[in-house]
Amino acid sequence: MRDGFIKVAAVTPDIRVADCEYNAEQICKKMKEAAALGSKIIVFPELCITGYTCEDLFWQEVLLNGAKDALDQIRKESREIDALVFVGLPWEWKGKLYNVAAAICHGRLLGLVPKKNLPNYSEFYEMRHFEPANEELDYIEYPGEEEQEWIPFGMQQIFYCPQMEGLTVAAEICEDLWVPQPPSITHAIAGANVIVNLSASDEITGKDSYRRNLVGGQSARLVCGYIYADAGEGESSTDLVFAAHNLIAENGTILAQSKRFENEIVTADLDIHRIRAERRRMTTYPTTQEEYEWTEFELKTEETKLERTFAQMPFVPQNKNDRERRCEEILSIQALGLKKRLVHTNCKSLVVGISGGLDSTLALLVAARACDMAGIGRDHILSVTMPCFGTTDRTYQNACELTRRLGATLKEVDIRKSVTCHFEDIGQDINCHDVTYENGQARERTQVLMDLANKSGGMVIGTGDMSELALGWATYNGDHMSMYGVNASVPKTLVRHLVCYCADTCEDRRLGEVLYDILDTPVSPELLPPEDGKISQKTEDLVGPYELHDFFLYYVLRFGYAPGKIYRIAGKSFAGVYDDETILKWLKKFYWRFFAQQFKRSCLPDGPKVG
């Protein structure tokens, strides 16, 4: 439960149709197994106490009384279970029979939630036996541990846990999810951020993918966690087969699902803090004034082992096909944004400072696409290489060859003489390789680019990426400044994949070779003299690994995670790559630079948002 994580379980027990005593034993057994795994919310299928396929046996008083006795047995067995448990059973109330979900915690029955939408089509005929839930909240008398208790009966119920801020749970049953307006919509806008669904969804060909999309889509639409527990093999197979397709989703992502046709326990770690952060960001997320019964349940405050995985590169899709689609999409967004600016300002040229590094390479590739979109010749791109004290032959040659292969206009301006003269003017010792020595070169390059843009009636295209801007790894009014920054919302780890995608898909073999060599070149501003002709100044040795900084950046910006939580999940994600001490070192560096360098981000040029 630390850091907003809570382990939940969707469970399919072995059952026998209409054998409530046996089913209660199996439910208790699975309940204890799920609790032993650390699960704090445990969800069983629809009508699991009796079995969903009892048909006209639901009219038998023996079955209904047996179901109540079984519920009481499960309730008592839950006394030592530190979890909120949901089980399904038929319940007679005011002369009508309802299909309900019973919420139990620490030996207490907290509430009964009836099913609203009863399917009576195709293979279903639930309206033969059950009454749909009405909108009215009622109370039933129930024998508690010490005295009679009044238990809420109705759909409008939310169960909340004071030991875990923000943990609010509501229930719906099977078909409730499949209708145009599920009860979970009202539950969510009333404040529930975890929805449980007790289901008995039969298996027919192709239904599993639809079900998976339905659960994932509902969790995305409602910005919630969704736990879906499905009936399994023990149900009658007279007409139907049930595959125990259990699913756990969070905000559009399927975190876990069972192997179909096997009754099993599926667990996952929901991130309640993440759900709440997403809802805070969504200022259009509505709230309801409807009356809801809020029932408290208690859980022990303890840390469970975190099983959830986190991608080392959260900005980059792990699947190759998804990654390629994402790269094409991002390049199109960048190029279209630049094309609009190019046409709107009636620019005659695009001026790009090309260094032979990743960022300027991506900017040049985007500029070429923008010209193609606008129907303008690529010779209108002025690709400027500006060798100085730190330039190596490798980056220089790559910059020149890249420009030629893309069909841009190459211009070389050697700035060594002008920088040396400038150092003499301000009294800077050329042998003192301090911040003035480095930034003087960066600002001279920007001045050259700005003047060339004026001279050619063009605009300077910024090359700096989001990771550099987050860390302030840019010279103020040097490479920090341009007239349109195409890479401003692209993190460094993604820049690398965008360039790689261009290399993989380009038809020009020589262009691909140049791009691969650029990818193989260490990241460097090349502001210090090389050693033996090779790059001596490596950015990641100075500010830290970009894969770590992009990981930190993602969870700071996207979900507002606290430093301790980021440190914890980074340790899990990069186990075996970086030790805890190294991660902490660069996390501290990240936060220091992120806040200290805000002044640079306060005056950035425009640039397209890509994600």
What are these model-derived regions, one by one?
Residues 1-353, 369-378, 410:
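Enzyme catalytic cores with a strong preference for nitrogen-chemistry domains
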